[in-house]
Amino acid sequence: MYQVLTPSRSSTLALRHLNYHVRHWGPEQSDLPTLVLLHGWMDVSASYQFTVDALRQSRRIIAPDWRGFGFTTGTPVDHYVFADYLADLDLLLDHYAPGEAIDLVGHSMGGNVAMMYG
């Protein structure tokens, strides 16, 4: 069985009529930019556990569960467009990393969001 090296913490943020679940690893503060990990379609933030453990850095890392995935609530109608993901990301960063430089990494759909955001 896999032994987690860096346990995560969870928080929930009311955002655009949804309850967003965000997973956190590492210290609350770091001299390094916050690393923001964006998961792909049909995935969840917890899938980054292996990546976080492999990094072995004392760095603040956050990863949201996108709307309708993991522990984040979904919309009443299955309506998912990139404009919503970009707006959600903008507000998430305003809350968790206001005015900070960040390193933004995405996989699959999360990579598309990261590229469009940058």
Locations of regions flagged by a protein language model:
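Gly/Ala-rich beta-loop-alpha elbow adjacent to hydrolase catalytic centers
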Residues: 106, 110, 114
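Active-site signature of alpha/beta-hydrolase-fold catalytic machinery across serine-
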Residues: 50, 116-117
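Active-site loop/oxyanion-hole signature of alpha/beta-hydrolase fold enzymes
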Residues: 18, 66-105
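Alpha/beta-hydrolase fold catalytic core
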Residues: 1-36, 56-59, 94-100
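Conserved HGGG/HGGXW glycine-rich cap/lid loop of the alpha/beta-hydrolase fold
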Residues: 21, 25-74
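Aromatic pocket-lining residues of Rossmann-like dinucleotide-binding sites
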Residues: 55, 117-118
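Pocket-edge positions in alpha/beta enzyme catalytic cores
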Residues: 12-14, 40, 77, 81
